[in-house]
């Protein structure tokens, strides 16, 4: 299989996956969008607003946000730990990893999403520390509706997932400046089911694919794969 054919195979695989994932999780994602507005304080419908009147300043206690904050505060003194039986060295390293301020913050952010809207997503990745050294890190996806989860995974932590994707809508000017990919396409080959402004944006897709017990990640844009990395994992590092 030549490189062009292989790229088209990966892109086709993503398109099939993205549609099936969107179809399965779309109802949840639409509910999450409504819940987020409610949590943010948009809690009055048209009838409520008409009864309140235009000249009345709304002043109310956001019970939902306070309840979420209370549950999170209850969790903080009892944070999740990894423990390995008869492997104290691994347990110590896991404690150090989760105690890192960035990683612990990510865990709390995912918890807030899970409590508030029913879904939080964590991603294992790598980053550079202040000395320029590569370190493992954990980060939370702020807008979980931009995540595509494996629709056929059966385990609670999605440990058996074969695919996942993270979608970022990027301005077309940024696309051209950063990747040199032509932004003239009205309908890019690498696209998503969700609605967005095709004239202004293009989806930048980070696609995780597990084949033969090896995990690959592809950065895709427009009609091409702009980056490909083989990950040192045996699992998809996108964890709901």
Language-model region placement:
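Extended, helix-rich architectural segments
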Residues: 1-203, 210-215
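Extended, charged amphipathic alpha-helical segments
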Residues: 207-240
